[in-house]
């Protein structure tokens, strides 16, 4: 498993404001989008490109163009939606699928799938899974398996925060035949007894969109 944790003062600054409990939802949403754009630079480092002949105002040249079929960005609902704008700004030619998963509160490593809007065949597609929090790792593993069942073999996960327990679970439960990369802004200390990341930032979905009882 290829893990990349961003090391940049701008990321550290924005992440500190994001974590602050006094940061309002409007600012929180803007910061998530900005952080994802910074992550996308690393996440797309190995994106497939092809030669493209063009003419500049001065001379013809061979440039680069994102290869077909187009990459697909898959936000894990609902918190992953907050990351979608940043990713599509960086890869505007990408298609977007949606995957609704939530943690089983009685068994945190098990997931409940409640929505799916994805192509049936993902063979040959580069997939970018986006979900702000990698806590237990259960959602990420389940989502990766879900894409792999549809033929995906090249998956990059983009998360803002991770916990050591989640990283360990992902590494132990991923299908080794999948080319998998994980990009994070930071890895925090641990999970608490409610499986929240510590120090973390709270519930990302609630902070993005407000609490839903």
Curated annotation (Swiss-Prot):
Residue numbers binding uracil: 197, 202-204
Cofactor names: Mg(2+)
Statement: the UniProt record of this protein carries the keyword Cell cycle: no
SUPFAM superfamilies according to UniProt: PRTase-like (SSF53271)
CDD domains: PRTases_typeI
Any one Gene Ontology BP term: uracil salvage
InterPro entries: PRibTrfase_dom, PRTase-like, Upp_B, UPRTase/APRTase, Ura_phspho_trans
Domain of life according to the entry: Bacteria
Keywords on record: Allosteric enzyme, Glycosyltransferase, GTP-binding, Magnesium, Nucleotide-binding, Transferase
Similarity comment text for this entry: Belongs to the UPRTase family.
Name listed for the protein in its UniProt record: Uracil phosphoribosyltransferase
Species: Bifidobacterium adolescentis (strain ATCC 15703 / DSM 20083 / NCTC 11814 / E194a)
This protein's encoding gene: upp
């Amino acid at each position: 498993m290829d893990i990349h944790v961003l090391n940049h003062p701008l990321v550290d600054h924005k992440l500190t404001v994001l974590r602050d409990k006094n940061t309002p939802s409007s600012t929180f949403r803007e910061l998530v989008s900005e952080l994802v754009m910074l992550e996308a630079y690393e996440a797309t480092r190995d994106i497939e490109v092809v030669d493209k002949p063009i003419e500049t105002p001065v001379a013809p040249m061979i440039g680069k163009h994102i290869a077909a079929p187009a990459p697909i960005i898959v936000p894990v609902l609902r918190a992953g939606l907050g990351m979608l704008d940043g990713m599509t700004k960086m890869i505007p030619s990408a298609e977007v699928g949606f995957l609704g998963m939530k943690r089983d509160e009685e068994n945190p490593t098990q997931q409940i799938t409640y929505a799916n809007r994805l192509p049936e065949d993902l063979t040959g597609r580069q997939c970018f899974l986006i979900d702000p929090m990698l806590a237990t790792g259960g959602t990420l593993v389940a989502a990766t398996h879900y894409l792999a069942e549809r033929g995906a073999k090249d998956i990059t996960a983009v998360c803002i925060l991770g916990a050591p327990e989640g990283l360990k679970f992902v590494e132990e439960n991923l299908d080794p035949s999948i080319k998998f990369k994980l990009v994070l802004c930071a890895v925090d200390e641990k999970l608490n007894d409610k499986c929240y990341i510590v120090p973390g930032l709270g519930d990302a979905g609630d902070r993005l969109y407000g609490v839903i009882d």
